[in-house]
Amino acid sequence: LIPILESIDNLKDELWESVYSSERTIYLNFLSASNLITNSIISYRASKPDIQFQVSQLEMTESCDIHIESRIAISVTPPHPQELPDGVVRREYLREEIFLAVPPDSKFAKHKTVDLREVKEENFIRLGNGWQLRGICDDFCRRAGIRPQAVFESNSPESVRNLVAAGLGIGFWPEKAWGGPPGHGVVLIPIRYPICRRDLVVTMFEQAKDKPVVDEFMDYFCRYFEKETLESGDVTL
């Protein structure tokens, strides 16, 4: 009888640990802004080390607490949805500018702004196919009526930065999602035509409504995003 009672007590402990672990685990799926999201998780866990993350990059979102994707910004200001789709309990839109990144010796480096039609003959360093930002930037080019001449494609912001700094081409650079300014050797120029902005859409699903930690992290991520600003000297304004 005693071994049976001990087994029951152990099972209760295991079930409690399982429930506690689930309540302290955030299931996060994202298709954009991987650098920003990774850095925000590291920063968040520095003060909340007991919170765990299960991270995925999938088109399907049924099993996640939070999903982050990007969309081209059409409206003047980020939308504020009054009605949410079924299964969604919260949605935030985080807007950022998309700049043109050029080497310091580029003829465009001293420009205060640039029209994409002016760079139609330039070589571009681009993100690889399949990335949402790549599709958004392709749409910017279509709106400007240009077809970028790609000399290199990479899925790494660091590679884009290094190749632009080396003078091999120009590229697009998001204001915040890649973790701020690119650093020495790259100049960022605001694009005046077409308007080049995107929204990061952060969605919290109904399955997470009883997990306060998910709502807390979503608040933290939104604040973290707003703090990511480009330093003067890195951008031509």
Predicted regions and their residues:
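Beta-alpha-beta core module
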Residues: 84-91, 95-97, 158-207
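Alpha-helical "hinge/linker" immediately C-terminal to small N-terminal DNA-binding modules
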Residues: 1-17
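Short beta-strand-to-loop elements that line the ligand-binding cleft
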Residues: 51-59, 127, 147-156
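Alpha-to-beta junction loops
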Residues: 51, 67-76, 98, 146, ...
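Secondary-structure junction motif
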Residues: 108-109, 122-144, 210-214, 228-233
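A late-sequence structural motif
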Residues: 36, 186-231
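Flexible hinge/capping segments at coil-to-helix
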Residues: 84-98, 102-124
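Central regulatory/effector-binding core of bacterial HTH transcription factors
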Residues: 23-81
